[in-house]
Amino acid sequence: MIGKLKNLFKLGKGKKEEKAKKSLEGKGLIIFENTKDAMRAESILKDKYKIKVVAPPPEIREGCDLAIEYELIDEFGIKRELESNDIKPLKFISLNDYSLKPLELIKVKEVDGFILVRCGNMKITIDKEGNIVNISGGGCPDVPYLALKLKGRNIKDIKEEETPKNLGFTLCAYILNKGSSQRGHSWTIIDFEVLSI
């Protein structure tokens, strides 16, 4: 009986790994020298291509803690778009090698009625009513300012000009904004930009 259970767990594990490998087939990563270029590239490409901002795996990280995951079929168009906007990525890498799996930037967890969102090194905690209880992490000079401006406020009452990307000026503000997104008139926590309060 124990042998059958072990085989069952091994079988399930193999399927999970196979599914993860298939999810990366046909995808690539754009590696940038600095976060400014990565952020500009995202804003230029997001409406035209299926892209996602991720953290590059440590083995290939160069200069910047952000990379863009994209569909390989779009590589020619993406390269042309970046070139016409004077953005020069360090390299384009195929993700067909599963060992180069990018790291998810956003992790969402619910604990005792609080929603905890970690995006990169930034963390934001929100209660059931949508009130921001805490903002921490990152180590950037604008984190205390962001916490001062946003802590205690309800995410549904925060206007576009008061979101982290508009209040701050560093990678921390950008990352914190990735952990939160403006949807119509209410700010919502995102996990693949869809989880809402």
Swiss-Prot record:
InterPro entries: Se/S_carrier-like
Pfam families: Se_S_carrier
Protein name per UniProt: Uncharacterized protein MJ0011
Organism: Methanocaldococcus jannaschii (strain ATCC 43067 / DSM 2661 / JAL-1 / JCM 10045 / NBRC 100440)
